[in-house]
Regions:
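Conserved donor-binding/catalytic core segment of Leloir-type glycosyltransferases
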Residues: 117-156
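Active-site proximal beta-strand in glycosyltransferases
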Residues: 9-11, 28-52, 102
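Short hydrophobic beta-strand element within catalytic cores of glycosyltransferases
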Residues: 255-258
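Donor nucleotide-sugar binding/catalytic pocket of nucleotide-sugar-dependent glycosyltransferases
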Residues: 70-87, 91-113
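A charged, aromatic-enriched C-terminal amphipathic alpha-helix characteristic of glycosyltransferases
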Residues: 280, 290-328
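Nucleotide-activated donor-binding/catalytic signature segment of Leloir-type glycosyltransferases, i.e.
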Residues: 165-219
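Membrane-proximal helix-turn-helix segments that form the acceptor-binding/catalytic region
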Residues: 55-74, 201-206
Length: 328
């Protein structure tokens, strides 16, 4: 009821929200299920490990199933998600829904990473950015080497408490029916003695990992640009479609150490130098400065940045919408 009924096509810019956490409200005000031709953007993946808000759950909702009868197109931000989405649509008899891929745009007129910036940086960091669909423990396990001058860092961001340890985190261990509680204080955990040596070594290992990472709660936009212009980024992705952090690194020529997820390969290509298969390989690669410089050079010279501009996105999307409207 909040759209012009004379329009040929209804557009939903966040289908996931409409049919998941916004479903109750939109159903109450009779916006959904859609019963007219519509299209929209899908942002989440099929991963079920992080939240109940995922595409597996969305396809289970009756409102979405009914709405699919009237859907003419869905838009996603990766070929990886497009293939999964098309397969699911086919499985439920909705092959009439076209799925289009667009590249997520970002600001491209930004401060760039340079070798000089990195070398002159007196507080070099490898920064894990964000927590959504990331293994946020991996940065704690990454082994930089005893002589490394690169500080492991987490840029936490807002509403990310659930993905990183809180500063008042505590661990309870029950041994021989006796429960002992410890906080993550490096000093405390390395001075304590436990009867069970397994737990003794385990808690000390966790304490060392915990203290090996500096957590930055948040930064301003300008501070973020500066960080990415002279440091390295680290990601261990559980799943992905559009990865804003990767795109932000690409337009800045910033080296990023990342696992070789299909959606990332679409952005960085198959031969990017700082992919890793496991944390042992990640730890080995980051200790070699040549790998860092090769990754920077690759991003700076081998990737066409035009497709990340807002203009390119707008033109591509407008052409698709025009063709859809012309065909209905």
């Amino acid at each position: 009821k909040y759209h012009d009924k004379n329009n040929a096509l209804l557009f939903d810019n966040y289908v996931d929200r409409t049919f998941m956490w916004g479903k109750t409200v939109y159903k109450h005000i009779e916006v959904i299920p859609y019963k007219r031709k519509w299209c929209g953007f899908v942002h989440h993946t099929f991963d079920e490990t992080f939240s109940d808000y995922n595409l597996v759950e969305m396809f289970r909702t009756s409102e979405f199933r009914i709405s699919l009868k009237y859907c003419v197109a869905l838009f996603v931000m990766s070929e990886y998600l497009m293939k999964k989405l098309k397969l699911k649509l086919s499985d439920i008899g909705c092959s009439h829904v076209n799925v289009y891929v667009l590249t997520h745009p970002t600001e491209t007129d930004v401060k760039k990473w340079t070798e000089q910036n990195f070398n002159s940086n007196e507080e070099r960091r490898i920064i894990n950015i964000g927590g959504w669909l990331r293994n946020s423990y991996s940065i704690y396990r990454l082994m930089m080497g005893d002589n490394s001058d690169i500080k492991k860092t987490v840029l936490k961001g807002s509403n990310m408490d659930n993905y990183f340890p809180l500063r008042d985190s505590k661990m309870k261990i029950v041994s021989d029916n006796v429960m002992t509680e410890y906080d993550f204080s490096f000093k405390q955990m390395n001075s304590m003695r436990m009867g069970n040596k397994f737990f003794d070594f385990m808690t000390k290992m966790i304490a060392n990992q915990y203290e090996s990472v500096e957590v930055i709660e948040s930064v301003s936009n300008d501070e973020y640009d500066v960080l990415l212009s002279k440091n390295i980024v680290f990601l261990d992705l559980v799943d992905a479609s559009a990865v804003n952090t990767i795109i932000e690194c690409i337009v800045r020529n910033t080296p990023v150490l990342v696992n070789k997820h299909p959606a990332v390969v679409e952005l960085l290509g198959d031969t990017y130098p700082l992919y890793y298969q496991d944390l042992a390989e990640a730890s080995m690669k980051i200790r070699n400065k040549t790998n860092i410089m090769n990754a920077h050079s690759y991003i700076a010279t081998q990737i066409n940045k035009k497709k990340f501009t807002l203009k390119y996105f707008d033109e591509t999307f407008s052409n698709i919408i025009h063709n859809i409207i012309s065909s209905i």
